[in-house]
């Protein structure tokens, strides 16, 4: 059983599998194709979704086998240090790692998994399937959150 507000006092490395999975807000941004500037290391998001992402629910359709089916897919828990730079600034894993609070729309805070979509944070209605994308550079998006 997950303890209430576990994310406020427990580091990522100490979380149970259940707690770790509960941290995911379901935005789907980690499943978008990204481009990295080789000179600066800056990461750019596209609106192009991985072929395994359900574009309505913003969840992986084959979560257990995703790393085998999509070799570029990062297993966050196993590759957290490398993965952090690829995660959006709103991502709970990144926020907790940086000692920050979760946003009010996060399902753990709001109690409702739809708030991430209602707040316009998820890729619902924005992402397109990779099978229809063509050149990734044609689909760059700015997901930055202004404080």
From Swiss-Prot:
Belongs to the UPF0260 family. InterPro entries: Puta_zinc/iron-chelating_dom, UCP006173. This is UPF0260 protein Noc_1358. It comes from the Bacteria. Pfam families: CxxCxxCC (PF03692). Disulfide bonds: none annotated.
């Amino acid at each position: 059983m997950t303890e209430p507000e576990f994310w406020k006092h427990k580091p990522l490395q100490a979380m149970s599998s259940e707690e770790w999975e509960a941290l995911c807000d379901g935005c789907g941004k980690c499943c978008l194709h990204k481009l990295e500037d080789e000179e600066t290391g800056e990461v750019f998001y596209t609106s192009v979704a991985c072929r395994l992402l359900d574009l309505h629910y913003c969840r992986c359709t084959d979560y257990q086998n995703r790393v085998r089916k999509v070799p570029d897919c990062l297993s966050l828990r196993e590759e957290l240090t490398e993965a952090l730079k690829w995660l959006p600034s709103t991502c709970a894993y990144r926020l907790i790692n940086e000692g920050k609070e979760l946003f009010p729309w996060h399902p753990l805070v709001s109690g409702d998994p739809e708030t991430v979509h209602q707040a316009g944070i998820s890729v619902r209605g924005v992402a397109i399937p990779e099978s229809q994308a063509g050149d990734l550079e044609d689909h760059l998006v700015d997901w930055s959150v202004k404080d």
